[in-house]
């Protein structure tokens, strides 16, 4: 069922369509993050439809511990559970296992750790992650991997990447088995492998070559935006992405800001996800084409303009900065909800603009104009070769 159709290119940037059992994804795309099956900020799947969301992302670990993946399967899978008929990507739970668990023990078979909810002991390995994601019935499942710290010592990273490769082979074998079962929720579930290697470009390149041989449905670059600088992240993408299959979707995990996304697209990335738009929105920080603003600032107390003039999101079509600020100050849920809706709409609309620019063959000029308007680059410094990344 999966088919990746490359429509246009500009440098390394790609404009494509990814056909899945739950619909066609136009890329580049930003996936809206609903960790536990919902976007934080009282955002419904009906809202997601209205603001142009193409793909929702949920988390394997969190849905496993609550309400339980077996319960979700009994209820018909995550799509029916959420009332969402478009693509869903589930990440493997690996990042949460390695970042949330204070007590964990890594072995070849997998990881032992304690639940963040009640402390009970949990084991998760490649097979368990695939089984949970199969129960959820997501469109795209992510391979179980270890996300090594960005500044980890080289010997540790080498051992970690080798183990991640072995785990990926086990993930592929288990997914093939699960997709063949009669009672599987989604027999067309796809598997994306994850490139790791911290900030060691040669390890990343070697790993990219190895996992590319497995002929998976797509590939992700993981383990970035976890402590390294933006310059280091872009360097790793420059070095690594060319060694991943160009005719398969490429996903940059957990990234990021609007500037990060523009730079990622320029380096050949198709899929992005990040909690920034919802997290920032819940704290009154909203995105505009002139940069991010904090609605808690007193200067917006009597500002009757929408968050952004011309924006067609549910917040901007009806409400003023002053009113939304009042709601936020009063800790009224509606204020947070409106900010989250605006930010997600901003991201989704920016991705549509990126796709339009690639279709028209002017992505580079769009990117530079967007970064300049948002205050992310100084054109004089850029011309002199002193460009700074944000």
Regions found by a protein language model. Give the residues of each.
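A non-catalytic, amphipathic alpha-helix used as a structural packing/dimerization or gating element
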Residues: 128, 132, 136, 159-170, ...
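Non-catalytic, usually N-terminal nucleic-acid engagement modules in DNA/RNA processing proteins
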Residues: 1-184, 298-301
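C-terminal extensions of enzymes
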Residues: 1-19, 25-31, 41-42, 145-151, ...
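Glycine-rich phosphate/ribose-binding loops and adjacent secondary-structure elements
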Residues: 162-165, 174, 178, 186, ...
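Structural signal for hydrophobic packing residues in well-ordered secondary-structure cores
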Residues: 137, 168, 172-175, 179, ...
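Glycine- and acidic
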Residues: 149-154, 158, 218-224, 333-336
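Conserved, mostly hydrophobic/aromatic
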Residues: 23, 56, 91, 133, ...
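Short, solvent-exposed loop/turn segments at secondary-structure junctions
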Residues: 32, 62-64, 95-96, 148-149, ...
């Amino acid at each position: 069922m999966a088919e990746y159709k490359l429509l246009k290119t500009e440098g390394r940037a790609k404009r494509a369509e990814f056909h899945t059992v739950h619909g066609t994804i136009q890329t580049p795309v930003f996936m809206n993050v609903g960790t536990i099956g919902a976007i934080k900020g009282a955002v419904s799947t009906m809202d997601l439809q209205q603001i142009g969301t193409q793909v929702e992302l949920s988390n394997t670990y969190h849905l496993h511990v609550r309400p339980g993946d077996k319960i979700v399967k009994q209820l018909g899978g995550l799509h029916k559970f959420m009332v969402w008929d478009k693509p869903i990507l589930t990440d493997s739970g690996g990042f949460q296992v390695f970042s949330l668990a204070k007590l964990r023990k890594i072995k070849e078979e997998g990881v032992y750790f304690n639940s963040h909810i009640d402390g009970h002991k949990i084991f998760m390995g490649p097979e368990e992650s695939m089984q949970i994601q199969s129960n959820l019935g997501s469109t795209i499942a992510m391979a179980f991997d270890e996300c090594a710290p960005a500044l980890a010592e080289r010997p540790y990273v080498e051992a970690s990447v080798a183990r991640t490769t072995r785990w990926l082979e086990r993930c592929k074998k288990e997914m093939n088995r699960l997709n063949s079962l009669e009672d599987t929720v989604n027999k067309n579930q796809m598997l994306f492998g994850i490139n790791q290697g911290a900030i060691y470009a040669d390890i990343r390149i070697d790993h990219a070559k190895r996992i590319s041989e497995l002929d998976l449905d797509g590939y992700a670059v993981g383990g970035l935006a976890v402590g390294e600088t933006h310059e280091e992240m872009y360097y790793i993408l420059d070095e690594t992405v060319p060694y991943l299959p160009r005719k398969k979707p490429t996903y940059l995990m957990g990234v990021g800001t609007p500037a990060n996304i523009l730079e990622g697209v320029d380096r050949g990335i198709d899929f992005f996800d990040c909690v920034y738009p919802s997290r920032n929105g819940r704290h009154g920080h909203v995105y505009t084409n002139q940069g991010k603003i904090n609605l808690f600032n007193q200067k917006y107390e009597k500002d009757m303009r929408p968050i952004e003039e011309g924006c067609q999101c549910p917040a901007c079509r009806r409400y003023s900065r002053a009113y939304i600020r009042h709601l936020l100050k009063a800790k009224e849920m509606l204020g947070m909800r409106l900010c989250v809706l605006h930010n997600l709409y901003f991201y989704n609309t920016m991705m549509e603009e990126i796709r339009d620019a690639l279709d028209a063959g002017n992505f580079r000029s769009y990117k530079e104009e967007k970064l300049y308007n948002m205050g992310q680059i100084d054109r004089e410094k850029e011309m002199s070769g002193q460009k700074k990344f944000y």
